[in-house]
Amino acid sequence: YEIYLKKQPIPTKLRGVELKWRRAGMKIALCGIGTVGGGVVKVLAENQAQFQAKYKEDLVISHVLTRDPDKVDRLGLESAVFTDRVEDIYEADIDLVVEVMGGVDFAYQVIRQSLSQGRHVVTANKDLLALHIDELQALANEKGVSLLYEASVAGGIPIINGVQVGLAANQISGVMGILNGTTNYMLSHMTQDGWTYDHALSVAQEKGYAEADPTNDVGGFDAARKITLLSRLAYDTRVDFHQVSVKGIDTVDASDIAIAAQAGYTMKLLGKSTKTAAGIQVGVEPVLLPNAHPLSGVSEA
């Protein structure tokens, strides 16, 4: 990522993110238990002692919302935590709701209801957030709880917390980054190995990087949702996902890559936004970068 800063006086009060822990331990409702949900269970189990030592509290999964009770058993959780009724989540004494179901409509209902009940929420649902982040964040602020979504952008890179907290004393004028691993994998091999677009997409699908319908990735829409969220945080203002200019790599072919390479350039799909006196411009498009540019060397997924 590249984030452009303007010098700004340090504010008298920085806004951080803090979860309020209850003495009896934090009760967690896990909504969804697929690959991501299973990973959450594993992380909590492996690091329970560390959490307890640091926060003097236990983290307890008290409810798991899923249609398949066998998934609960396979992860070694007690069968009593299973429920297929979202009403059980709403009616229980829960501190934190972790939404890892995916989709938009039902997940939105669960998150909105949880926040309205004064519960902290963690989600990685960028599709939902790109559409509803302003409403949900306002509700979280009103109820005095946290809405956390670090994993929605850039996976393990703590870019959201970096913007919210680490750069809170700065005025950001621009953001640019490679925001989609699938397309970066494809472009990397089209550049380095001479793969055609169709072959690169086929391999990406075989490896599980791209879905059977790859439109979300190759069309640039996944990156567009991410740059929408980052831009909203960077400029502390509403950014309409539907107003983002989006162009993917689905029209790029091997000859485009070869011509760029001969001229000393590397093609990357970038999410970019800038803030000027005229307003905020946000977009996603393939860009030719000089080979010496730091982002040119970012390869694979």
Regions found by a protein language model. Name each.
Residues 165-225, 230:
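Conserved anion/nucleotide-ligand pocket segment
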Residues 201-297, 301:
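Substrate-binding/catalytic subdomain of NAD(P)-dependent oxidoreductase enzymes
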Residues 108-113, 126-155, 160-163:
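Rossmann-fold NAD(P)-binding glycine/threonine-rich loop
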Residues 25-117:
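N-terminal glycine-/serine-/threonine-rich beta1-alpha1-beta2 phosphate-ribose binding loop
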Residues 102-104, 180, 287-290:
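Short glycine-rich anion-binding loops that position phosphate/pyrophosphate groups of nucleotides
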Residues 31, 99-101, 124, 131, ...:
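Structural motif
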Residues 1-25:
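Short, Lys/Arg-enriched N-terminal segments with co-localized hydrophobic residues
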